[in-house]
Amino acid sequence: MYHYAIFGGIVLIVFGIDPGYAIVCWGAIAFQNNSYRAIGYGSVETEAHTDFNARLEYIYDELTAILSRCRPDALSIERLYFQTNQKTAIKVAQARGVTLLAAQKLKIPIFEYTPLQVKTAVTGYGKAKKPQVMEMMRRLLKLEEMPKPDDTADALAIAICHAQAAGSALRRVLYDRGTHYQ
């Protein structure tokens, strides 16, 4: 599931996270020569009637195992923004915290992006709706079907957002050094 080939150029492996506490969706992509390929995607789901601390531990353990297998160059995660439900926001923030801890313990660099940044990166429109984001993920990653659960497409989009930002930064560094990069 986490195999990729290097055919020349620089390969960047990015792991995207759409945080939650009932379900944490993830997506791993390879970015090379301005093209993307899905390496894997899925979700970590917790039982609703389980002790909340046990749910956090489960999220941490599962993501640590997945990240250890995938070995990404970077983890990108959506920056939280809640307007109404503070109780939900706090629980999602706690789940997000154990996600960040898993990456930090594995020494994976962490990058945050707003939903506006992610939507703009993948659709060109910061107010795109979920079906538009999902369709762009299917097209950009050449997937035969839509990723399930739906929030998995968001995790893949978050990964692509970082790959674009990192690719631009890498091109600038290589250009400054006089190194050719395609």
Regions found by a protein language model. Give the residues of each.
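Phosphate- and other anionic-substrate recognition elements at nucleic-acid/protein interfaces
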Residues: 2-182
